[in-house]
Amino acid sequence: MDILGALESGEKYRLEIPGLPSPIDLPYVEIPEGGKRLRIVSLNLVGLTGLNRDLGKLLAARIRSAIPDLSGVVFLTAVEKALMLCQAVAAELGIEAVAVAYNRVKPHMQADRRPTLQVGSSSVTSGSKFLALYERDINLLLSATRGVVVVDDVVSTGGTLLALNDLLEELAERHGRDPLQMRGIFCVAREGDPQALLPAPVFSLASLPQPVLL
């Protein structure tokens, strides 16, 4: 039985991931792209607690295999689609806190009195946007002595990952230290072929079809 059942209508793509008890039927969606429409398979994990838990266990095992010693390593993710997944991975690995890049500077960050960082980014599902770190995440990243692990839901063009790397480089420059090494990018799925040279190896559980421009 499909994990998501019949929660979403329309044509579906069946994603099978080794280790999951059942396949996931994901909807095809069309999003604006340069005056046309881009047809993609939508993997939206927001709100799916059980699926995030199960995928988190699988990704945690992949991380343990690739990086057996996680001491001095800080986990980083971007809101909002990958946040629950990253929290599930961290819980499985016994990681107490993860650094989060937000999609804009928010009021609680108190940017007029606390340190913040912001860079631009672009992704298939979110389009052009900003990514921002505030004091708590900055200090957590500065505590890393052996690099950073990025957790994401889907790696497509790589725009979000390049923006995360820009944040790490800006953070290092501002604090007069060498840039933090991105040790690996761990995701549920890769979508098509990356359009950019990514800053770290990508470890995925599955693959999604190439987006189609209509």
Task: Please state what every model-predicted region is.
Residues M1-S71:
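Active-site-facing substrate-recognition patch
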Residues D69-E80:
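Short glycine-rich phosphate-binding loop at a beta-alpha junction
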Residues M84-L93, L164-N165:
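Short Gly/Thr/Asp-enriched flexible loops that form oxyanion-binding sites at enzyme active sites
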Residues M1-R14, A163-L214:
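PRPP-dependent phosphoribosyltransferase catalytic core
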Residues V73-V74, G147-V149, G184:
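Structural motif
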Residues A82-C86, D193-P194:
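Short, well-ordered alpha-helical microsegments
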Residues D152-L164:
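Acidic, divalent-metal-coordinating active-site segment for phosphoryl/phosphodiester hydrolysis
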Residues E96-V148:
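Short, glycine/charge-rich flexible loops or terminal/linker lids adjacent to PRPP-binding catalytic cores
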